[in-house]
Amino acid sequence: MKPFKTQAHIHSLDGQMDEITVLEELGNNSYLVDYRGVKCSAIFNPFNSTYYADDIYGIIKEKTNNG
């Protein structure tokens, strides 16, 4: 899947729309997205064709190699 930009409802903006970059599909309607430099989870609602990004509780930390 090639990354692409689209609009999404953003959790920290109380559902207001802003631009995200969809990076990867994780599962059924579940995606890894980038919102202002923060990688977080998002869901896609196929009924209204809208993404919902959770940049509060859905932040995905990068794995680091400590050893």
Regions found by a protein language model. Name each.
Residues 1-2, 35:
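Generic alpha-helix initiation/capping and coil-helix boundary signal
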